[in-house]
């Protein structure tokens, strides 16, 4: 089997999610360890081996009404890795993705054909993609309300959301109105929204402060404390397990977003029981400007 595998690869359980049981493997020894780990996290004791793609993870959203798909949004998941082999931490969701114009230009026609070929008449479709310098690869389509709460962002920008469309369809049989559907069509002048986590390293939390100050920063519209004093942070068991707090904020442009992100992380203080800083520093330039840091 190994002779047919081009490393690196991702090994994961076929029936789990959120990064649980996943490993990045770069040789045969790591592959054997990754398979054993994946089987431990799989009810079916079955591992899945995939190509490891080094690229951006982007969600592309389409609203479909009466059989007509229309490009709505593309968001981006920002991650960081704890080690050479560790699965990435989920750091942030950014609306829109830095790659949104490229994806709309290069992929819209193909994505519309795909959705039409499936015979979907009404709904909000998410296409999870890996984006590299030379390709955009769809690897997980979803036909549900997304866990990134993109409907909240849509509501704040346009006054309507896909959740309201689904409720209307359940009650009346009509998937919203054409006028409201038009409001969910992407426009390049929409502001930037980001949901970012304060990532914590291993240790027992002895002090957690600053979130009240964060709530008063311009653009911040929601703050949620996920971990509390006394909680023990261990090595990552899933992509979300290291988040100490979630902050949601908006900004009119990337420069303003960068300033506000700095204010947020300057305000947050988390120390372990020995007084050591537990907050893992993030690359705020990448969150604001993208990996090219084209300012």
Predicted regions and their residues:
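A short glycine-rich, hydrophobically flanked beta-strand micro-motif that places a catalytic Asp/Glu
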Residues: 50, 121-133, 178, 279-284
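Active-site nucleotide/adenylate-binding loops and adjacent lid/helix of ATP-dependent enzymes
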Residues: 1-47, 54, 65-67, 93-109, ...
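Peripheral (often C-terminal) accessory segments that flank ATP-dependent C-N-forming ligase machineries
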Residues: 167-295
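A short, glycine/Asx- and small/polar-enriched loop/turn
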Residues: 5, 131-137, 238-243
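A short linear hydrophobic-aromatic micro-motif
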Residues: 8-10, 45-49, 178-180, 221-224
């Amino acid at each position: 089997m190994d002779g047919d595998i081009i490393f690196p690869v991702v090994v994961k359980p076929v029936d789990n999610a959120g990064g649980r049981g996943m490993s990045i493997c770069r040789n045969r020894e790591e592959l054997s360890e990754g398979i054993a780990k994946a089987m431990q996290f799989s009810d079916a004791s079955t591992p899945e081996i995939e190509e490891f793609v080094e690229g951006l993870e982007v969600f592309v959203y389409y609203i479909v009404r009466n059989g007509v798909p229309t490009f709505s949004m593309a968001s981006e998941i920002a991650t960081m890795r704890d080690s050479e082999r560790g699965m990435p931490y989920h750091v942030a969701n950014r609306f829109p993705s830095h790659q949104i114009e490229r994806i709309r230009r290069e992929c819209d026609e193909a994505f519309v054909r795909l959705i039409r070929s499936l015979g979907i008449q009404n709904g909000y479709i998410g296409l999870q993609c890996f984006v590299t310098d030379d390709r955009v690869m769809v690897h997980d389509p979803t036909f549900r309300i997304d866990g990134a709460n993109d409907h909240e962002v849509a509501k704040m920008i346009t006054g309507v959301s896909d959740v309201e469309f689904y409720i209307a369809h359940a009650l009346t049989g009509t998937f919203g109105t054409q006028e409201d559907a038009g409001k969910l069509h992407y426009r390049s002048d929409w502001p930037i929204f980001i949901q970012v986590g304060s990532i914590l390293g291993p240790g027992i939390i002895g002090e957690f402060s600053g979130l009240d100050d964060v709530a008063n920063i311009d653009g911040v519209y929601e703050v949620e404390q996920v971990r509390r004093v006394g909680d023990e942070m261990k090595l990552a068991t899933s992509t979300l397990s290291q988040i100490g707090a979630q902050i949601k904020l908006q900004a009119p442009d990337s420069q303003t977003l960068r300033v506000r992100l700095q204010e947020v992380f300057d305000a947050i203080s988390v120390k372990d029981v020995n007084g050591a800083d537990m907050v893992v520093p993030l690359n705020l330039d990448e969150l604001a400007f993208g990996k090219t840091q084209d300012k």
